[in-house]
């Protein structure tokens, strides 16, 4: 009799489980059927494509889309990422810079305008047609803020044409602006109770008057009454990749900038430029170093890991102490890049970055010693 009841319970359990699995497959099938044909084909070819659980707000974050100087074409990874947006159904798309392939004095006005036209074809126009807001920061290949010996901008024409493109009413990125007086270089906007600030991190230097504007914006009631604050910039605070581990490739006075951002409770700084995805933190500031979709992914410093092109689905849960979760995909394979696959810390020339799931106190003595021997204690603290 006991054996009969055991078999009966097992049969009932299997029936319920089978129904649940079938329902899950049906839901997936229903979602697949609603997707555009191009999206559905990519999802089917990927096999078990991870669909992260939704929370309050979802961003898809991309970066560094460009290829060679003057190019008006984009790598397949860019088009693939754009095609997958209907699968992830973000509330907004965010880009941490380098949307076009400028920063060359040899480029003519017509060539620069052609690059922005190509960007519009591949990225901006599809987003507008999908009614997806697009928050972004200017990169060095978009409109570098590097200056000459007289203090003028080396790439003045590129800056003028970038501003011209973005300020055309037909190119409205669909943002709820708060301050757009110096858009697209320095501006603020809000989205679903999140305050966003974009600064011009297209070079390592931010002038004092612009830093004053940044601080004033972060101190404003709009910023402080928001549930969360996010900063967008191109150059990161600290170096993480080979070929970028030197002054000029990160923001000057990184620790001072971080202290200011922490003072106003900025949660996350989203950056690009180093062409490597690394989910890090330093102190109380989350540092999302974005992978690229364009040309030239870079390896991490002190690592043998192969470089990967990647994009990140960032979900925000206002009830969670962590606020954010990342689902980052190798855009070639569409496999998730897990935290455990990445270095536990990176010790670039101007300071340590720790992987976001690890605290300073959890680092091994050998890891702390490695950093301190290279950089000294001041640059290796929590």
Task: Walk through the language-model features, giving the residues of each.
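Positively charged n-region of N-terminal signal peptides that target proteins for export
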Residues: 1-4
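Bacterial N-terminal signal peptides
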Residues: 7-16
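Active-site glycine-centered loops adjacent to acidic/histidine catalytic or metal-binding residues
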Residues: 64, 97-98, 139-140, 234, ...
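Short, solvent-exposed loop/turn elements at domain surfaces
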Residues: 67-73, 102, 206-208, 240, ...
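Extended active-site neighborhood of metal-dependent phosphoesterases/phosphodiesterases
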Residues: 26-49, 105, 109-224, 256-262, ...
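His/acidic metal-ligating clusters that form di-metal
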Residues: 83-92, 127-133, 190, 195-197, ...
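A short C-terminal boundary segment appended to hydrolase-like catalytic domains
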Residues: 23-37, 312-382
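N-terminal active-site segment of His-dependent metallophosphoesterases
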Residues: 23-113
């Amino acid at each position: 009799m006991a054996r009969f009841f055991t078999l009966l319970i097992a049969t009932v359990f299997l029936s319920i489980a089978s129904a649940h699995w079938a329902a899950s497959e049906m839901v997936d099938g229903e979602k697949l059927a609603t997707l555009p044909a191009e999206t559905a084909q990519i999802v089917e070819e990927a096999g078990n494509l991870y669909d992260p659980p939704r929370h309050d707000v979802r961003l898809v974050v991309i970066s560094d889309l460009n290829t060679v100087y003057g190019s008006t074409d984009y790598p397949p990874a860019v088009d693939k990422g754009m095609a997958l947006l209907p699968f992830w159904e973000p509330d907004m798309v965010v880009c941490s810079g380098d949307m076009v392939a400028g920063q060359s004095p040899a480029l003519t006005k017509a060539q620069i305008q052609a690059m922005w036209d190509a960007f519009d074809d591949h990225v901006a126009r599809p987003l507008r047609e999908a009614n997806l807001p697009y928050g972004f920061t200017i990169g060095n290949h978009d409109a570098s803020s590097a200056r000459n010996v007289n203090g003028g901008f080396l790439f003045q024409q590129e800056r003028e044409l970038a501003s011209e493109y973005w300020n055309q009413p037909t190119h409205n990125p669909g943002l709820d602006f708060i301050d757009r007086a110096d858009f697209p270089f320095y501006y603020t906007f809000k989205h679903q109770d999140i305050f966003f600030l974009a600064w011009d991190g297209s070079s390592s230097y931010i002038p004092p008057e612009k830093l004053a504007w940044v601080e004033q914006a972060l101190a404003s009631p709009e910023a402080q009454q928001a549930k969360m604050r996010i900063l967008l910039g191109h150059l990161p605070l600290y170096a993480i990749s080979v070929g970028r581990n030197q002054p000029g490739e990160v923001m000057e006075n990184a620790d001072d900038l971080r202290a200011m951002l922490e003072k106003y409770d900025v949660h996350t700084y989203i950056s690009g430029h180093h062409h490597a995805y690394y989910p890090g933190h330093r102190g109380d500031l989350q540092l999302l170093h974005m992978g690229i979709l364009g040309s030239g992914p870079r390896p991490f410093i002190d690592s043998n890991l192969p470089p990967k092109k990647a994009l990140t689905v960032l979900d925000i849960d206002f009830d969670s102490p962590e606020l954010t979760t990342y689902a980052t995909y190798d855009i070639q394979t569409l496999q998730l890049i897990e935290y455990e696959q990445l270095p536990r810390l990176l010790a670039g020339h101007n300071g340590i970055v720790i992987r976001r799931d690890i605290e300073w106190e959890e680092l091994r003595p050998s890891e702390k010693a490695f950093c301190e021997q290279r950089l000294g204690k001041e640059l290796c603290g929590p």
